[in-house]
Amino acid sequence: VSGKENQDQAGGSIDRSTGKAGFRPQGGGLMTTRRSFLQGAAATGIVFCSCGMESAARAQPKPPRLPVKVGGKHVLTVDVHSHCYFHEALNLMGDTADKVLPPVKGVPEHFIVIEQRLREMDAMAIDMEILSINPFWYGKDRDTAAAIVRVQNDKLAELCASRPERFGAFASLALQFPDLAVQQLETAVKKQGLRGAAIGASVLGQDFSDPKFHPVWAKAEELGAVLFVHPQSTPELAKRFKGNGWLSNTIGNPLDTTIALQHLIFEGTLDRFPGLKVLAAHGGGFLPSYAARGDHACFVSPQNCNPDIALKKKPSEYLNQLYFDAMVFTAEGLRHLVAQVGASQIMLGTDH
C-alpha cells in the first residue's frame, strides 16, 4: 500500500471536497493495475438501511476515525468485500426469503443504520467500504429476478450521494438471463453511477466460461466494470459436506471460487476478454496456492485438454490478470498470497 496522502487501495486519489475518485492512466503491459481497477467505484455512495435514516445519521456527532499511516502519512483504506441486504428485495423472494441470509453471527447487522456502520468502520480503520450483495435470485424467473435487481440497484443509486467519501457499491445482475444482465450492467454504470457488479461463482452450476455469458463479459470489458466473484458453495457436493465443521463454507466456498477462476483461464475466456477486471473473494480460494499444478495438466494428460483452445500463456500467469481480496485470516496466509500473485493484485477485504 502506498504511503501517499489520500491514496486508496486501488491506487487512485480521492478529492475530499467532492468524494470523487481521480485515477491517472498507466502504461505498460497486459497486467491491469490497481490504479485502473476500481475506476471510480470508490466514489459511489450507499447507505445500509432502507428506513430513511440519512438525516438522523448526519445529525449524529461524527465518531473519531482511527487512521492508518505509512511513513507518517495517512493511507486511505478501501474495503472491497463488505455485505448488506435490503428488506424490500428480500420481501420479493416470497416463501424462500428466510433462506437468503447466511447462518452466521451478525447477520441481522446487515440491516443497520448508517451511523452504526460508520462506527464499526472507524473502529477497524476502514475509510471506505464497497458494498456487495451475494446473489440469491439466480433461481428466480425473469420478472422476479429483474424486480429484485431493480430494487437493489435503484436503492444504491438513490442513496449514493449520502456519504460518497465512505461508501461505494457493486451492482446486482440477473446473470441467469444474460441479455437482461447486459442491460442492467449498462444502466448501473452509465445511469446509476455504479462501477461494477457482484456475481456468484457460477449460475446454478453453469460456469462463466459458457459462451452464453460472453455478452456480459464483453459489456463489462467495454465499460471497465469490476466483476466481484463471491462464492455460493458447491451444492453438488452437499452429501460430502455433511457433518461437523460447516464444510460447505470452509471448503465449499473457496472451492467454488477456484472452479470459477480455473474455467475462465482454461477455456480461454480471459484471452477473449483480456481487459476484464475480475476480483476474487477470499483470496481467490485455493487457486493461488496450487496454480502451478495447472501449468502441468495439459502437458502430462493432453487427452484431457481441448486442442482447439490454445492459451496465450501459462495458466499460472493469468493470476496477473486477476485481483484477490486479502480475506485469508492470518498474516502468514497473506504473506503467501503476496508471494504467489504479487502485492499489486491484492485488495483489502474484510467480509464485513
Segments and roles (model prediction):
Residues 3-5, 14-15, 19-352:
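Helix-coil boundary/capping segments in enzymes
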